[in-house]
Amino acid sequence: MAAVLNLQLKVDASLKAFLGAENRPLHGKTGATLEQILESIFANIAIQGTSEQTEFLDLVVEVKSMEDQSVLGSYNLKEVVNLIKAFKTTSSDPNINKMTFRQVCEAFAPEARNGLVKLKYKGVFTNLFTTMPEVGSKYPELMFDFNKGLNMFIMNKAQQKVITNMNRRLLQTEFAKSENEAKLSSVSTDLCI
């Protein structure tokens, strides 16, 4: 098995256990309830994005049953994000310690996608889809910045194209930003002479 897959599986199991401790959002949750809460958590993270500059909403999210709308669980989004970041920094595994928040979230990309599919029918989309809807076309649930954790081989060609085009656009944007920063720093150095 690939080392990257092993690490993703370890992150998946370890983070579920970490969030399952007493007074945490997954405590006592199993099966379909556990999956629905994870889908909600990672869909909400995907909506805002995993940049270090992202300020997550400090509000309680209730996860409700699809059948009878009973509350299955609830969590504070900002607190859960802080717990995930604490998991990363306090892990005894040096490979997990070195991961970015985005890389930790990649292990839960399928849950994010599943949650985003449900939200799509309620008119809720990720910030990435909102800024580039032409790239997402019919698959807005694939437009999030940790979609690298999705298995491209179980997608159709149109879905693969959405992910490829989105990641290409993000790379172009990052490259343009770094070029502008380099130009600005050379201008400011010239002024100091």
UniProtKB/Swiss-Prot annotation:
Any one of the GO CC terms: helical viral capsid
- Please indicate if the UniProt record lists Transcription as a keyword: no
**Keywords attached to this entry:** Capsid protein, Helical capsid protein, Virion
Its predominant location is: virion
Explain the post-translational modification.
The N-terminus is blocked.
Q: Where in the cell is it found?
A: Virion
What is this protein's name?
Answer: Capsid protein
Q: Which organism is it from?
A: Apple chlorotic leaf spot virus (isolate plum P863) (ACLSV)
